[in-house]
Amino acid sequence: MRTLLVLALTVSAWFFNTESAHAWGRIGHDLAARVAAHLVSESTSKPFYKSRAMDLGYYCNVPDLVWKKTHYDIEWTNHFMDLEIFNREFKKRIEEGKLSPKEDPYEMTRAAFNTKFSNIPDNAGRGYWRVRELEKRLQATADLLKQKDILKEERHRLQLEWLIVAGVIGHYITDLAQPLHVTENYDGQMTEQKGVHSHFEDTIVDQLWPSIDMQVYKEADRLWEKERGAMAGKTSLALMKELSDSSLKELDEILKRDKKTPRDDLKKAVEVYRPIVVRRLAAGAVVLAEIWRRHSNWVPNEDKFYAFSGEPAYIQPSVPPPTPTPAPSPTPKK
């Protein structure tokens, strides 16, 4: 009995440590989704998206707050991309003549990629694939909503499905907007800065709220006006890669500021990080808005549409990891 208790406590401790870091926390994910809803509503002249901003903000938190509770082993690797690991392997294969410089391995399906690049484990991240798989589902739902002869009850069911899938896509997109979610040095463990992950995305963002809200809205409006035309001509994968690359470029600055700023001096720390947080949340919201916009060409029926799901059913990845993939150390992993 004692052995079982010790084992249970050990597993619980591992689970708590590996799950403890959520990109942007509740506030950041919710804010980015609400901003995206505003952008889509304005650009499509459909108030439906703005009126459902609360719903979308909630669903944007579902992958962390709901799905990780029941499907952690197959879910957690979908929340990040350790880009350095991928880049090193791609470069090596190009040098060995095993990969053409013109090939983009990210365009492969999850199953094909896992087969060809079996030495890049799931715990290096599968965020790009998660978004693309869910976007296919969002498109299928949008296609059904375009039909004109659907009964009201069925249309409402499909509208709820659209909101849920769109919202959870938002979670993975905004994960990619977080610099510490696109690097193997995700918690500063490689630079003797453990704890920087939750300090940046949880503590700092929580302290910045609510003053940060309007700043993110304004920055997103500016970016949307500037980039929306160019974004419309790019694939979702291209948008994700650009978003992740821009996130990675902010990493050194975050680590530098962390070393210079005492974490317990929150009054100073929040102002040190404010510009970066605003930029990253706005960048994520804009990419998310463009993805939603592509699947918004249908007419909502808002007549007594009160549907809401507190705990949406888990949506499986196309290829779940063959066996549970524990985090490599007690250090929090996205």
Q: Residues of each region from the PLM?
A:
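SAM/dcSAM-binding transferase cores
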Residues: 176
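Bacterial N-terminal signal peptides
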Residues: 5-16
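N-terminal, motif-rich segments that launch catalysis or mediate targeting to/interaction with membranes
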Residues: 21-164, 168, 179-334
